[in-house]
Amino acid sequence: MVREIDCNELTELLELYLHLHENTVPDTTEILNNAWNTIVQDKNHHIIVNEVNGKIVSSCVCVIIPNLTRDVRPYAFIENVVTHKDYRGKGYATQCLNYAKEIAIKENCYKMMLLTGSKDDKTLSFYNHAGYNSADKTAFIQWLE
């Protein structure tokens, strides 16, 4: 079942992120709790999860960003697309991305964007099949310490 995350599911989400790029679940600190509270209280920040048999197996984040161009239409940014390694290839992440697209359409976004650090052909093909292309824009990243 695809849905938005409940505020009491932080631990499950952090455990899923171990299948993204994290090595450990962060300690519960005031900084973590403040960040989580900010996220769940932000009407433009959507953490989408796919639950199978009571377990969160896939997720993505969809942030709606207000904009002053394109007829003052917002755009959506997708981040942290992840599926538990034991559940990959079953369409769960695609369902999360489709849910994000529904949110973006409802919010009148004119585009959706995502970045991936992966160069793996399977990952790139996944995003292409989900409707994203890598031809229209060039992304630049500046990592901050």
Question: What do these predicted regions represent?
Answer:
Residues N80-T83, G89-E102, H129:
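Conserved acetyl-CoA-binding loop-helix of GNAT-fold acetyltransferases
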Residues L14-W36:
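Conserved GNAT-fold acetyl-CoA-binding loop/helix
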Residues M113-T123, I141-E145:
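Conserved beta-strand-loop-alpha-helix junction that forms the acyl-donor binding cleft
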Residues D71, H84-Q95, E107, K119-L124:
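Conserved glycine-rich acetyl-CoA-binding loop
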Residues M1-L13:
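A short beta-loop-alpha structural element at the N-terminal edge
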Residues V49, K55-I64, V82:
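Conserved beta-strand in the GNAT
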Residues N37-V49, F77:
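A short helix-loop-beta-strand connector motif used in the catalytic cores of GNAT acetyltransferases and
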